[in-house]
Amino acid sequence: MRVALLSDVYFPRVNGVSTSIETFRRELPGFGVQTLLVAPTYGGESAAPDLIRLPARPVPRDPEDRLMGYRAALALEQRLRDEAVDLIHIQTPFVAHYAGLRLARRLKLPVLATYHTLFEEYLHHYLPVAPSGALRGIARRLSRGQCNALDRVIVPSQAMAKRLASYGVTTRREILPTGIPCAQFAGGNGAGFRQRLGISPTRPVALYVGRVAFEKNISFLIEATDRARATLPDVLLLIAGEGPARAALAAQVAARGLGENVRVLDYLDRSTELPDCYAAADLFVFASRTETQGLVLLEALAAGTPVLALAEMGTAEILAPGEGTVTSPDDPIAFASLMADLLTDRAWLAALARAAPTHASRWSDQGLAGRLAHLYSDVLAGHAPRN
């Protein structure tokens, strides 16, 4: 089987969508599925036979992101025909979505999409002058129209499936999270990572990994760290990632006098640096309210690092009492109290750390890729070309 993946985002842009695409592309050939990825160019990427880079333009207010050229995407029609593509799988709801739909109609192919992101909660961060209620309504209507034009919609969590149903999406929804390569995150050199950063082996360290964006609610973690230092004066919050909220968060850190308690790192290489970073932390902390899955929580658990998080949207489906995770109320005071308790109680942390890898193994990359391959076959078997 040959599947064309269309996405407005891919590496070197680091986020959950890029990671999901890479994970499935790596594992699907083991199930008889070859992929051809169509993605924007960011400049300087090396060529690959199974990856087409299209001219792209930056997204306003978020220069890290790109939108592929619509006409350039449609010009791939003959290439996809020559490649004997069987199915089109859209990964983003922007230019890639509309180009993917058009190509599928022209080629009479089935088309499905993964709904990775809860856009109704994101738009107001990027269009702050517009009323947030109106933007949410627009996002819901757009999502409904986009999803109902597909043969199938993949969502990474039950919470996201319910949200799309509330929009009026009638297309069949399949719950299929992205898996993780658990072995890749096990056995990181945490002591070496601490030494490289000049962090004492005994200092209590909490870690956030991910995009430094407003919707990730990192300001909540900074406030919680500020409150936790009343009990643990040397507590350290590491923030590993980049994004449009860095300047605002730096201002918050300065205003609270947290220069010695919060450090912001750049993006870390997923295979060579990130496992060491997870292993260096005593606790992984996460406060996003809009995650459709929360891959970084699983990565931390696979590394044996306990997780403290809010149980919101897809994150709630990962959190399980006693399975390496602790759930906090959506309140920075309560979060800070749990954070301090965990970092102080080494026996509790150790018990959670022992349970964490087993819990993470339920999201194995191979197992979930096999489910996706089966879904592709099911969609192909039931496909009747639309007008």
Predicted features, each with a name:
Residues 1-56, 366, 377:
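N-terminal subdomain of nucleotide-sugar transferases
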Residues 19, 204-230, 237, 244-250, ...:
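A conserved mid-protein helix/loop that constitutes part of the nucleotide-sugar donor-binding site
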Residues 80, 147, 267, 275-281:
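Short alpha-helical donor nucleotide-sugar binding micro-motif in glycosyltransferases
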Residues 186-199:
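A short helix/loop element that forms part of the nucleotide-sugar donor recognition site in Leloir-type
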Residues 247-268:
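Nucleotide-activated donor-binding/catalytic signature segment of Leloir-type glycosyltransferases, i.e.
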Residues 289:
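Aromatic "clamp/platform" in nucleotide-sugar-dependent glycosyltransferases that forms part
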Residues 306-309:
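Short hydrophobic beta-strand element within catalytic cores of glycosyltransferases
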Residues 320-333, 341-346:
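Conserved acidic donor-binding segment of nucleotide-sugar-dependent glycosyltransferases
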